[in-house]
């Protein structure tokens, strides 16, 4: 049974029941992966119902489907929790069918199938785990796992076993692998009120990167443009003011007027207004 198809059909039926004319073509892989992550958290054993942040979920879907925020939050919660329970039961049914099919095969064939199915992901870890179990007894192995879990609270049981398998039962080597990041720790969902806001750091970063890659507009021409200031065509005019019959600048500095020498032709045009001479006769 395809879990993605279950989520897809349930979400479509829920939206169309409240918004009949909704455009469901906007629901792409990005929003479906976000919903899948939220449902996985709700279906986990450590999840608590109060940790589901309905406001963030409604705000996210409102960006894709206008009018989703008008749906009652209680109905949205009921839909999400019912869908999470449905997915959990579907996973349990699928795992039960796989166990029944494995029981029909002989022991050697089932071992070959299990090793062949997981060879791509855990081939190296399986070989090293076989060497480790030959050196360390089961009781000491459990004690070492418990010590690792106490030293690294964020470390899960699977990750502790992987570190011990790679280190071949060497406690110091396993601690070094976890500290140096050779065995990546996945943070478990916290029981705080903000759990619904972030599914996990890794999923959140992948979601952001996919949204930016799909919807962000990058102006490539902006880097090619060269911005140059416009040069003025004419020099700014200097303001000259007059104060007390003297030419001064805007700062109050005085200038002495220098008379220009006029040509002789211009001087001939001037009229002399001198009074006539008085002639006295003896």
Swiss-Prot record:
CDD domains assigned: CUE_CUED2
A GO-annotated cellular component: nucleus
Keywords linked to the UniProt accession: Cytoplasm, Nucleus, Ubl conjugation pathway
Domain of life: Eukaryota
Protein location: Cytoplasm; Nucleus
InterPro entries reported in the protein's UniProt record: CUE_CUED2
Protein function: May play a role in targeting proteins for ubiquitination and subsequent proteasomal degradation.
Record protein name field: CUE domain-containing protein 2
């Amino acid at each position: 049974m395809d879990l993605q198809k279950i989520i897809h059909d349930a979400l479509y039926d829920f939206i169309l029941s409240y918004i009949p004319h909704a455009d469901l073509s906007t629901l792409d892989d990005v929003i479906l992966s976000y919903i899948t992550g939220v449902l996985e958290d709700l279906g986990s054993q450590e999840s608590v119902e109060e940790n589901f942040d309905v406001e963030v979920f409604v705000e996210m879907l409102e960006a894709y489907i206008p009018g989703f925020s008008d749906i009652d939050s209680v109905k949205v919660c009921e839909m999400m929790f019912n869908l999470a329970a449905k997915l959990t039961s579907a996973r349990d049914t699928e795992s039960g069918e796989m166990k029944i099919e494995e029981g029909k095969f002989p022991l050697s064939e089932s071992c070959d199938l299990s090793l062949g199915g997981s060879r791509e992901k855990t081939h190296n870890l399986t070989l090293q785990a076989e060497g480790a179990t030959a050196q360390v007894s089961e009781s000491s192995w459990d004690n070492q796992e418990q010590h690792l879990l106490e030293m690294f609270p964020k470390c899960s049981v699977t990750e502790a076993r992987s570190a011990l398998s790679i280190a071949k039962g060497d406690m110091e080597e396993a601690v070094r692998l976890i500290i140096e990041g050779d065995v990546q720790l996945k943070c478990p969902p916290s029981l705080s009120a903000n759990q619904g806001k972030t599914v996990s750091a890794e999923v959140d970063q992948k979601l952001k990167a996919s949204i930016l890659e799909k919807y962000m507009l990058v102006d490539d021409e902006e880097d090619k443009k060269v911005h140059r200031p416009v040069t003025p065509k004419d020099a700014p005019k200097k303001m000259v003011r007059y104060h007390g019959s003297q030419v001064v600048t805007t700062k109050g500095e005085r200038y002495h007027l220098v008379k220009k020498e006029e040509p002789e032709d211009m001087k001939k045009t001037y009229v002399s207004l001198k009074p006539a001479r008085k002639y006295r006769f003896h």
